[in-house]
């Protein structure tokens, strides 16, 4: 590298010829001479010189030329040797640099490993101010100066010696590292309660593990991350070693000195480690002065006096510990100042790292922000709180206010709703309310234990659950649980239902899981959502039948859960009013009503009857009112179903008239029940068709399997045609049942909206179908067009082949005719030869003409392409954009007879392309200033026309 720097050429060199430039080396001239082969004179003509002439003889000039050639060859060899020597020198220099880098890396790695090792003496601990190997300090660390290989001006011979020195140092470091590791591995712990004898014959007691952990101070180690960023030579000056972490943990367990706190101190003692924080200020100042006076590369050894570890108490030790930490801080600062001084000394010798400045100001001291860990650590012997004390139940966090308890349903209750009393407890859902002297067993779903003071309740206890999802309590009504028994007679229950409104005010009402109330009990439910039952109408449950008053009633609970399992038969004088929260009208499985019962349903929300309707008696007054809606409510299906035979016999079924099939109680089911009952409905439809006459089978609507919405229901409803409506209106339609005649007036107006909606749906479907059909036809015609184009191309090729064959045969026939004519008319023997010559000339002329024609075509094509390129450039120059001629490409120039698609009008149709070009050129308006562009466009069109004529 130094040689290359010395060989730099001056910048401002005058440009001279190679032979006259004195700065050009002879090596370069030799290389240039090598390129030009030497011309050796062979067979030179030599003439004797005239005796009076002063010219050099010929043999003398030949000798001079030979000597000059030899000199050139010698210079060439010297230049080659010099070049090889330089290459070898540079290669060796690169190899030496790589070896140095590897040695430096290994030395740095060994020094890092040595910084965490212990001293060679087993009784001494390694401090931060001491070297790892004090006995082999000069060998391990080496000279603070740089190796001679890095010094400027040194020779190559010293580099090999320096490499050997580096290898010896690395080997010594590895050996000492192995010794330190063996000593660390062979270090054994001291038995508990056994004192260790130090060189000063002083016994020191050992602490227990708890005391050591409680008194373990923060390490005063210096942030070593910045040391890792410094160069390798700076590390040679920094001799502080970080203690090995596991080794120091073992020291906590083994050396149980009261005042010995584990810290990476900056001084060592050969005779023993005494208390760092118990010594006096004078000793500390003496140590500081000694540390400042001693050179940094030496090992500092200090003996401590007057240890105070025997008389110190717990609080004094903590105080002295903090004072010791504060004293270490200036000592560490002095340490870094000395390290900085050594670094400045070594900077003068460094060549590769001349700009390195250690950033000692960024080193953070852990001592400033560290607190003793012993204050924050509790001894293991302290009793630990049990887990049950730490568990806080959600029920315990509820604060009872005097006079009232806020429930989640408070916003939905009436204003005069009575809240719980003071002595009542708030329980979770599905729990019971007990008196004061009874225990409570809460039901925790996610816990496996119960509170301490709670027990299991008995069945006969009163339960007051907290219902979060209901708000149907009346003003003066208390909560009833799901499985609560019958309330007394004088109790007034007025539930409030938000989702239903189809029971009158004076209707009796029974909750889901309650028994039947007696006759004199007044139950007044309040329904808000629906109003299609009369005031004096009783409400029937889903699975109950209507019987005369003197019958006993046992409800059938198949699909509901509002009656308990153990409910018995009620007496005659009781009214039955179950709660039907999930229904909008009368449930399924409903029996027919007796004759004396008057039912007047108000069917405002439907326009025809649902399925599963039972038969009513003939004398029953039925006046449906279908005014407001156009389609069925949700989950409603329409078909007729035969009545159950629970309360009627086959004889009664035969007496039912067809007119009774028209108006039956509606039914609402959940979607799951509808899916489960689909197979049974098909059987019912078949039975209904068998029982009805053939004329009425058209009015039995089949069940729709996938019935998701009322819109889909309306699609499958069989409606009468306009003619049938007209006949029904006139009353002349035979075979139409009376029920349909009764509802004809309502259906004529109510089905208009569904029919309009159905027509819109049909229009959309027809439109989609027409679009699909159009796409199919389009695909078909495109395929047909492609096939036609291919067929036309095949026909053209076939015609060309046929024409060639015809032309060849015609020529052969013409030649045969000419031969016959010559044989008949020309008897001259030389006439045949003349004719053959003439034919040969004609053939040559034809061949020549075809070649010329092909050449002209090529020239025309080249000319056209050149014109095309010229026009494109000029149009881009004048920012002229042209629209495309066809759909084969987005640009005007994409249209070409040779590149267009086979279904394009210009495909192999030069005549059409030329015609389109001419029409376009005549129609386009070229600016007046662009005369060259106008001329180029016209030339392009005329060239295409000539090409077309030649073709």
Curated annotation (Swiss-Prot):
Its protein name is Coiled-coil domain-containing protein 15
State any GO CC term. Answer: cytoplasm
- Assembly description: Interacts with POC5, POC1B, CETN2 and FAM161A.
Coiled coil regions in record: 64-89, 154-193, 782-813, 839-874
Q: Which species is this UniProt entry from?
A: Homo sapiens
The reply on keyword Cytoplasm is yes
Q: Briefly, what is this protein's role?
A: Plays an important role in primary cilium assembly, maintenance, and length regulation. Interacts with centriole inner scaffold proteins to promote proper centriole size and integrity and assembly of functional cilia. Required for the recruitment of both the inner scaffold protein POC1B and the distal SFI1/CETN2 complex to centrioles.
PANTHER family in the record: COILED-COIL DOMAIN-CONTAINING PROTEIN 15 (PTHR14817:SF2)
Cellular compartment(s): Cytoplasm, Cytoskeleton, Microtubule organizing center, Centrosome; Cytoplasm, Cytoskeleton, Microtubule organizing center, Centrosome, Centriole; Cytoplasm, Cytoskeleton, Microtubule organizing center, Centrosome, Centriolar satellite
Cite a single GO BP annotation: positive regulation of centriole elongation
- Name the keywords, alphabetized: Cilium biogenesis/degradation, Coiled coil, Cytoplasm, Cytoskeleton
Report the domain of life of the source organism: Eukaryota
